[in-house]
UniProtKB/Swiss-Prot annotation:
Component of chylomicrons, very low-density lipoproteins (VLDL), low-density lipoproteins (LDL), and high-density lipoproteins (HDL) in plasma. Plays an important role in lipoprotein metabolism as an activator of lipoprotein lipase. Both proapolipoprotein C-II and apolipoprotein C-II can activate lipoprotein lipase. GO terms for cellular component: chylomicron; intermediate-density lipoprotein particle; low-density lipoprotein particle; spherical high-density lipoprotein particle; very-low-density lipoprotein particle. Pfam families: Apo-CII (PF05355). This is Apolipoprotein C-II. Keywords: Chylomicron, Glycoprotein, HDL, LDL, Lipid degradation, Lipid metabolism, Lipid transport, Secreted, Sialic acid, Signal, Transport, VLDL. Residues 1-22 form the signal peptide. It comes from Macaca fascicularis (Crab-eating macaque).
């Protein structure tokens, strides 16, 4: 569960990073220093890698199969309840928007 979440989070951040990199900004009078940007990017990357490694170590150290099973069960029950309530809410909104006929 944790590894998949971290992988998904990394992929989302990677896509967002490419979107930010790919955005074309209009020319400015004074372009930003590429050295500063690369240092900031390297610094953020190293912080991210160390935080990811620390989170992975903490997860592996505190992993309990019983707790993991309870969390999976809680997640499945809560998502089932939320989908039910979302359906009810959607039905109510549609009936209000549609009006009485």
């Amino acid at each position: 569960m944790g590894t998949r979440f971290l992988l998904a989070l990394c992929l989302v951040l990677l896509v967002l990073g490419f979107e930010v990199q790919g955005a074309q900004l209009p020319q400015q009078d004074e372009p930003p220093s590429p050295a500063l940007l690369s240092r900031v990017q390297e610094s953020l990357s190293s912080y991210w890698e160390s935080a990811k490694a620390a989170a992975q170590k903490l997860y592996e150290k505190t992993y309990l199969p019983a707790v993991d099973e309870k969390l999976r069960d809680l997640y499945s029950k809560s998502t089932a309840a939320m989908s039910t309530y979302t359906g009810i809410f959607t039905d109510q909104v549609l009936s209000v928007l549609k009006g009485e006929e």
